[in-house]
Regions:
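Amphipathic, hydrophobic N-terminal targeting peptides for secretion and organelle import
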Residues: 1-36
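Short alpha-helical linear motifs
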Residues: 8-11, 91-98, 108-112, 147-149
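Short, flexible segments with low predicted structural confidence
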Residues: 17-25, 43-45, 93-94, 120
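Short leucine-rich amphipathic alpha-helices used at interfaces
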Residues: 20, 26-27, 33, 45, ...
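Short alpha-helix boundary/capping segments
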Residues: 38-41, 45, 136, 140
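Core segments of small alpha/beta cavity-forming domains
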Residues: 41-97
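Surface-exposed, charged secondary-structure patches
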Residues: 96-130
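Exposed beta-sheet edge and beta->alpha loop/turn motif
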Residues: 118-163
Length: 163
Protein backbone atom coordinates (compact mmCIF):
# COMPACT_ATOMS: atom_id res chain seq x y z
CA UNK A 1 0.00 0.00 0.00
CA UNK A 2 2.75 2.36 0.95
CA UNK A 3 4.63 1.43 -2.21
CA UNK A 4 1.57 2.20 -4.35
CA UNK A 5 1.07 5.64 -2.72
CA UNK A 6 4.74 6.47 -3.26
CA UNK A 7 4.53 5.40 -6.94
CA UNK A 8 1.38 7.49 -7.45
CA UNK A 9 3.05 10.53 -5.88
CA UNK A 10 6.19 10.16 -7.99
CA UNK A 11 4.19 9.59 -11.18
CA UNK A 12 1.99 12.61 -10.49
CA UNK A 13 4.98 14.81 -9.71
CA UNK A 14 6.79 13.71 -12.85
CA UNK A 15 3.66 14.27 -14.94
CA UNK A 16 3.33 17.82 -13.60
CA UNK A 17 7.04 18.50 -14.19
CA UNK A 18 6.84 17.17 -17.77
CA UNK A 19 3.69 19.21 -18.44
CA UNK A 20 5.28 22.41 -17.09
CA UNK A 21 8.49 21.76 -19.04
CA UNK A 22 6.67 21.10 -22.30
CA UNK A 23 4.45 24.15 -21.78
CA UNK A 24 7.51 26.33 -21.19
CA UNK A 25 9.25 24.95 -24.28
CA UNK A 26 6.10 25.44 -26.38
CA UNK A 27 5.74 29.00 -25.13
CA UNK A 28 9.37 29.76 -25.87
CA UNK A 29 9.13 28.35 -29.41
CA UNK A 30 5.90 30.28 -30.03
CA UNK A 31 7.39 33.57 -28.79
CA UNK A 32 10.54 33.00 -30.84
CA UNK A 33 8.37 32.54 -33.94
CA UNK A 34 6.43 35.74 -33.15
CA UNK A 35 9.71 37.66 -32.79
CA UNK A 36 11.15 36.23 -36.01
CA UNK A 37 8.02 36.96 -38.03
CA UNK A 38 7.93 40.51 -36.66
CA UNK A 39 11.56 41.04 -37.64
CA UNK A 40 10.95 39.65 -41.13
CA UNK A 41 7.92 41.89 -41.51
CA UNK A 42 9.92 44.96 -40.49
CA UNK A 43 12.69 44.09 -42.95
CA UNK A 44 10.14 43.69 -45.74
CA UNK A 45 8.03 46.79 -45.05
CA UNK A 46 10.38 49.49 -43.80
CA UNK A 47 12.67 50.07 -46.81
CA UNK A 48 9.67 50.96 -48.97
CA UNK A 49 8.02 52.94 -46.20
CA UNK A 50 11.18 54.94 -45.48
CA UNK A 51 11.58 55.73 -49.18
CA UNK A 52 8.03 57.08 -49.10
CA UNK A 53 8.13 58.84 -45.68
CA UNK A 54 11.44 60.70 -45.81
CA UNK A 55 10.62 62.96 -48.78
CA UNK A 56 7.36 63.89 -47.04
CA UNK A 57 9.31 64.95 -43.95
CA UNK A 58 12.12 66.84 -45.71
CA UNK A 59 10.52 68.35 -48.84
CA UNK A 60 8.61 71.63 -48.69
CA UNK A 61 7.90 74.88 -50.50
CA UNK A 62 8.06 78.15 -48.58
CA UNK A 63 4.54 79.03 -49.73
CA UNK A 64 3.04 75.83 -48.30
CA UNK A 65 5.60 74.86 -45.65
CA UNK A 66 3.07 74.67 -42.80
CA UNK A 67 0.79 72.38 -44.79
CA UNK A 68 3.70 70.20 -45.97
CA UNK A 69 5.05 69.74 -42.46
CA UNK A 70 1.57 69.20 -41.00
CA UNK A 71 1.13 66.36 -43.50
CA UNK A 72 4.37 64.82 -42.21
CA UNK A 73 3.41 64.96 -38.50
CA UNK A 74 1.24 61.78 -38.58
CA UNK A 75 4.30 59.85 -39.79
CA UNK A 76 6.10 60.55 -36.49
CA UNK A 77 5.70 59.04 -33.03
CA UNK A 78 3.99 61.38 -30.53
CA UNK A 79 7.28 62.02 -28.69
CA UNK A 80 9.27 62.83 -31.83
CA UNK A 81 6.36 64.79 -33.30
CA UNK A 82 6.55 67.29 -30.42
CA UNK A 83 10.28 67.75 -30.89
CA UNK A 84 9.90 68.06 -34.67
CA UNK A 85 7.08 70.60 -34.33
CA UNK A 86 9.18 72.75 -31.98
CA UNK A 87 12.07 72.69 -34.45
CA UNK A 88 9.76 73.42 -37.38
CA UNK A 89 8.07 76.35 -35.65
CA UNK A 90 11.31 77.82 -34.30
CA UNK A 91 13.63 77.32 -37.29
CA UNK A 92 12.33 75.64 -40.43
CA UNK A 93 9.15 77.63 -41.11
CA UNK A 94 10.53 81.12 -40.35
CA UNK A 95 13.73 80.46 -42.31
CA UNK A 96 11.83 78.97 -45.26
CA UNK A 97 9.58 82.01 -45.53
CA UNK A 98 12.39 84.50 -45.00
CA UNK A 99 14.68 82.99 -47.65
CA UNK A 100 11.85 81.67 -49.89
CA UNK A 101 13.24 78.15 -49.69
CA UNK A 102 12.03 75.26 -51.83
CA UNK A 103 13.38 71.84 -50.88
CA UNK A 104 13.03 68.74 -53.04
CA UNK A 105 14.05 65.44 -51.48
CA UNK A 106 14.64 62.15 -53.27
CA UNK A 107 15.56 58.89 -51.60
CA UNK A 108 18.20 57.07 -53.64
CA UNK A 109 18.80 54.10 -51.34
CA UNK A 110 17.53 52.42 -48.19
CA UNK A 111 18.95 49.58 -46.14
CA UNK A 112 17.81 47.98 -42.91
CA UNK A 113 20.41 48.36 -40.15
CA UNK A 114 18.57 46.46 -37.43
CA UNK A 115 15.07 45.10 -36.98
CA UNK A 116 13.04 43.77 -34.11
CA UNK A 117 9.35 43.06 -33.78
CA UNK A 118 8.46 46.56 -32.53
CA UNK A 119 11.47 48.71 -33.47
CA UNK A 120 13.88 49.03 -36.36
CA UNK A 121 16.53 51.31 -37.82
CA UNK A 122 17.11 51.98 -41.49
CA UNK A 123 19.85 53.87 -43.31
CA UNK A 124 18.45 56.27 -45.88
CA UNK A 125 20.51 57.88 -48.62
CA UNK A 126 18.80 61.07 -49.70
CA UNK A 127 19.55 63.72 -52.29
CA UNK A 128 18.13 67.18 -51.72
CA UNK A 129 17.88 70.18 -53.97
CA UNK A 130 17.53 73.40 -52.00
CA UNK A 131 16.61 76.57 -53.86
CA UNK A 132 16.13 79.96 -52.22
CA UNK A 133 15.29 83.43 -53.52
CA UNK A 134 18.68 83.66 -55.23
CA UNK A 135 17.35 80.82 -57.45
CA UNK A 136 20.74 79.14 -57.31
CA UNK A 137 20.07 75.46 -56.52
CA UNK A 138 22.20 73.74 -53.92
CA UNK A 139 22.56 69.98 -54.25
CA UNK A 140 23.09 68.02 -51.07
CA UNK A 141 23.51 64.31 -50.40
CA UNK A 142 22.69 63.03 -46.93
CA UNK A 143 22.83 59.80 -44.99
CA UNK A 144 20.18 59.45 -42.34
CA UNK A 145 19.60 56.87 -39.65
CA UNK A 146 15.84 56.63 -39.30
CA UNK A 147 14.57 54.84 -36.20
CA UNK A 148 11.09 53.39 -36.49
CA UNK A 149 8.77 52.25 -33.73
CA UNK A 150 5.69 50.12 -34.23
CA UNK A 151 2.64 51.58 -32.53
CA UNK A 152 -0.39 49.38 -32.97
CA UNK A 153 -0.11 48.11 -36.53
CA UNK A 154 1.65 51.21 -37.86
CA UNK A 155 5.37 51.93 -38.18
CA UNK A 156 6.14 55.52 -37.16
CA UNK A 157 9.38 57.47 -37.26
CA UNK A 158 10.81 57.64 -33.74
CA UNK A 159 13.92 59.67 -34.57
CA UNK A 160 16.01 60.86 -37.51
CA UNK A 161 19.76 61.19 -37.09
CA UNK A 162 22.02 62.64 -39.81
CA UNK A 163 25.17 60.57 -40.19
Amino acid sequence: MRWRRWLTTVTGSLSVAVFVGLSAAGGWFYWERVQTRGEESARAVLPHQAADDIPKVFAYDYQTVERSLAAAYPLLTPEYRQEFQRSANAQIIPEAKKREVVVQANVVGVGVMSARRTAASVMVYMNRTVTDKSRQPLYDGSRLRVDYKKIGKQWLIAYITPI
